Amino acid sequence: MKKIAVLTSGGDAPGMNAAIRAVVRTAIYNGIEVYGVYQGYLGLINDDLKKLELGSVGDTIQRGGTFLYSARCPEFKDKEVRAKAIENLRSRGIDGLVVIGGDGSYRGAQRISEECPEIQTIGIPGTIDNDIPGTDYTIGFDSALNTIIESVDKIRDTASSHARTFIVEVMGRDCGDLALWAGLAVGAETIIVPEEKVDIKDVAEKIESGIKRGKKHSIVVVAEGVMGGQLCADELAKYIHVDARVSVLGHIQRGGSPTGQDRVLASRLGGHAVELLMDGKTALGVGIKQNQLTQTKFEDIFNNKGSKFDKQMYKLAQELSI
């Protein structure tokens, strides 16, 4: 292994810069040249690569986002387009590629490993949704979780002051981990996630029951993949008359300085990715389980989507929100 490239793809997540830093410094420490690919897979297609030195990643571990930029690249699904990207890697003598991102990013890496076996590929899970099998946590999840908690704590102050019900919409298209963990942490009265079917009438009855017990306000946390916050409020209004407001947290969840946990996680996974490349491994996603570094085949990751949801935690949240 003499030259590797690293890119970030898909939605940005706090801690991506820390992962890039770990990849670059681990590689250089072991005598490997590193090239940064700008704007994800689009950069591979356009040959937008730049050699990275130790100084290139100085003062980045605490920064949110990704200094390599990120972009969604649907055209990478085209085999002819991928062939151009692969040729760009070959022409530079790059024999290893580290991809930081989510499910779609991993699929692009798998295609490269299939169509050009001499270029090894390793995926690092970077997404706030925490929806990648093969790891307990993805880079950015803890940071986004803490952003949500801080925001909802402030929203609850207002909800309490005005005796209102607040519907808080958080990210999570197919995975409800952000909603579940945040809802449990802020003491939400109701948590609505894609993995568990919820009848809005039951939610309304629960809120009404609380009001009868003297409860003045409620917090409902809903994952965007189930329904929008406004739709949730409109549906509730069919069953109960409460002063309900909607707060869509949106892209604030992706921004900000990564937490200590995300910085450490990103550093460990970034270093491990380089070690796997040096060992001749390919088509693997790195992760962490029970605080131990792991690696999982891309195909196993794709075949186990939706397997991570913690039903016991959901049950606990239901019991604590009576």
From Swiss-Prot:
UniProt keywords, alphabetically: Allosteric enzyme, ATP-binding, Cytoplasm, Glycolysis, Kinase, Magnesium, Metal-binding, Nucleotide-binding, Transferase
Coiled-coil regions, chain positions: none
Family the UniProt entry places it in: Belongs to the phosphofructokinase type A (PFKA) family. ATP-dependent PFK group I subfamily. Prokaryotic clade 'B1' sub-subfamily.
Compartment list: Cytoplasm
InterPro entries: ATP_PFK, ATP_PFK_prok-type, PFKA_ATP_prok, Phosphofructokinase_CS, Phosphofructokinase_dom, PKF_sf
Species in which this protein is naturally found: Staphylococcus carnosus (strain TM300)
Positions contributing to ADP binding: R21, A22, V23, V24, R25, R156, G187, A188, E189, R213, K215, K216, H217
Any GO CC annotation of this UniProt entry: 6-phosphofructokinase complex
Any one GO MF annotation of this record: fructose-6-phosphate binding
One GO-annotated biological process of the protein: fructose 1,6-bisphosphate metabolic process
Binding-site residues for Mg(2+), renumbered to this chain: D103
Pathway: Carbohydrate degradation; glycolysis; D-glyceraldehyde 3-phosphate and glycerone phosphate from D-glucose: step 3/4
Gene3D superfamilies: 3.40.50.450, Phosphofructokinase domain (3.40.50.460)
Catalysis: reaction(s): beta-D-fructose 6-phosphate + ATP = beta-D-fructose 1,6-bisphosphate + ADP + H(+)
PANTHER family: ATP-DEPENDENT 6-PHOSPHOFRUCTOKINASE, PHOSPHOFRUCTOKINASE
Function (record text): Catalyzes the phosphorylation of D-fructose 6-phosphate to fructose 1,6-bisphosphate by ATP, the first committing step of glycolysis.
Pfam family, one: PFK
Protein name from the UniProt record: ATP-dependent 6-phosphofructokinase
Active-site residue list: D129
Documented activity regulation: Allosterically activated by ADP and other diphosphonucleosides, and allosterically inhibited by phosphoenolpyruvate.
NCBIfam families, per database record: PFKA_ATP (TIGR02482), PRK03202.1 (NF002872)
EC number: 2.7.1.11
Cofactor entry: Mg(2+)
PROSITE patterns, A to Z: PHOSPHOFRUCTOKINASE (PS00433)
List of residues binding ATP: G11, R72, C73, G102, D103, G104, S105
Known partners and oligomeric status: Homotetramer.
